[in-house]
């Protein structure tokens, strides 16, 4: 193998010290996200309950811990919806506190949403991803962070065996929960990430 464009995060600590390879490890412009359908029960963007739950969920995810421990320092916690390499990127956009881990505030917002419409033991937000793409450890960590903050029965993973299976389910709108998404811009512009 002469060229490898991606190194699994589990191997990232050793590849740079391996004398048999010439490593290249620089930040890129990809952003990894997940999407919650706007009409999903308890998560509807048109309702106060849905808005509170989305805000609580975002604050329940310890992005820094995931970047440090799961991705071995290869990620940067999001503070907006483009990457630090994108022209126009800002780490001080109004409202970016919603993208920062805040266990106390997350619980408070979750309880406000529960006062509107209670989350029951029958409810669970699942996170779909393709198992053949190296996403399992990341989504397990996301789910663990959410459950450790909001309650052990809030979230679960929903892996699909292959990217094709996953993409078909997303495109056919058969995923009944959150699903992995992201973007690699076609050209260096915030517009390409935000309007795409």
Where are these regions (language model features)?
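Short, solvent-exposed loop/turn and secondary-structure capping segments
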Residues: 8, 14-18, 68-72, 80-81, ...
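Extracytoplasmic/peripheral linker and loop segments enriched in polar/acidic and small residues
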Residues: 51-55, 59, 67-68, 152-166, ...
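Extracellular/periplasmic solute-recognition and catalytic clefts
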Residues: 1-40
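Structural transition elements
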Residues: 76-113, 132-137
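Sec-exported extracytoplasmic/periplasmic mature domains
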Residues: 20, 41, 58-75, 87, ...
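Alpha-helical secondary-structure segments
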Residues: 29-79, 122-133
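Soluble non-cytosolic domains of exported or imported proteins
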Residues: 6, 47-52, 60-61, 96-104, ...
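Ligand/substrate-recognition segments at binding pockets and active sites
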Residues: 6-10, 111-185
């Amino acid at each position: 193998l002469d060229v490898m464009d991606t190194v699994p995060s589990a191997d990232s600590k050793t590849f740079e010290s391996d004398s048999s390879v010439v490593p290249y490890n620089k930040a890129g412009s990809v952003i990894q996200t997940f999407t919650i359908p706007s009409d999903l029960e308890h998560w509807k963007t048109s309702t106060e309950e849905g808005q509170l739950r989305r805000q609580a969920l975002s604050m329940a995810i310890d992005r820094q811990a995931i970047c440090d421990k799961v991705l071995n320092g290869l990620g940067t916690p999001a503070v907006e919806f483009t990457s630090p390499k994108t022209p126009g990127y800002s780490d001080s956009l109004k409202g970016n506190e919603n993208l920062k881990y805040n266990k106390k505030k997350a619980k408070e917002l979750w309880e406000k949403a529960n006062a509107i419409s209670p989350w029951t033991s029958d409810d669970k937000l699942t996170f779909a991803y393709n198992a053949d793409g190296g996403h399992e450890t990341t989504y397990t960590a996301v789910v663990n962070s959410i459950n450790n903050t909001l309650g052990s029965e809030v979230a679960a993973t929903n892996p699909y065996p292959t990217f094709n299976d996953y993409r078909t389910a997303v495109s056919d709108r058969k995923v009944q929960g959150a699903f992995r998404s992201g973007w690699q811009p076609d050209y260096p512009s915030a517009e390409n990430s935000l309007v795409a």
